[in-house]
Design a protein with these regions (language model features):
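NAD(P)H-binding glycine-rich loop region in Rossmannoid oxidoreductase-like domains
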Residues: 1-35, 46, 63
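Conserved cofactor-binding/catalytic machinery of classical short-chain dehydrogenase/reductase
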Residues: 13, 36-39, 51, 77, ...
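Conserved Rossmann-fold NAD(P)-dependent oxidoreductase catalytic core, especially the SDR/UDP-sugar
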Residues: 35-85
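Catalytic helix-loop patch of NAD(P)-dependent Rossmann-fold dehydrogenases
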Residues: 67-116, 138
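NAD(P)-dependent short-chain dehydrogenase/reductase
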Residues: 100-149
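A recurrent short beta-strand within the Rossmann-like NAD(P)-dependent oxidoreductase core
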Residues: 163-169
């Protein structure tokens, strides 16, 4: 329970990484991704947390043929309702945007990270690279953005400290 933990510890900074990436029921994923994030944001606001660092995903922009390449921070958040992960990331980013207006004293750093790669890390995207062939469509770009675990750790450390606030792809 974020209210209990944040209320007991009274941290200056909260780093919120929780998200469901692997397939599960939509209801469970929603409870973790959206309801959990809502509770973290509310608990941070209630208990006077100075800074909230959240990892998001490019999936929040949605999977649309007219998305610009590359996507930048000012592009519209249009997560697809038909894809739970994309829809949930959109909802969380919308909640964060609302909180920036309602609770401006809660500094936010929203990191829109790509697929995380690193030693011992396995996910749906890394599984594609273990197959005998990597599926691609000729003449069709499919841009992926990757980040190494160590680089992400350094970015999170800076975000939790004196780094700038805002949304960063």
């Amino acid at each position: 329970d974020p209210y209990e933990v944040i209320g007991r510890e009274l941290p200056d900074v909260v780093i919120h990484l929780a998200s469901i990436v692997s397939p599960t029921t939509r209801a469970f994923a929603h409870s973790v991704d959206v309801v959990g994030s809502r509770n973290v944001i509310a608990a941070c606001s209630l208990h006077g947390v100075r800074r909230l660092v959240v990892t998001s995903s490019g999936a929040a922009y949605g999977y649309h043929a007219d998305n610009p390449v590359p996507l930048v921070e000012t592009d519209a958040i249009r997560g697809n309702v038909e894809f739970a992960y994309s829809d949930h990331k959109r909802q969380v980013e919308e909640m964060l945007a609302e909180a920036r207006k309602a609770v401006p004293e809660l500094q936010q750093v929203v990191l829109v990270v790509g697929t995380v790669l690193g030693a011992g890390l396995e996910n749906q995207i890394t599984a594609l690279f273990h197959k005998p062939r990597l599926l691609a469509l000729r003449g069709c770009e499919s841009p992926f953005v990757f980040i190494w675990t160590r680089d992400l750790a350094r970015i999170l450390k800076r975000a939790a400290g004196a780094g700038p606030t805002g949304v960063f792809n």
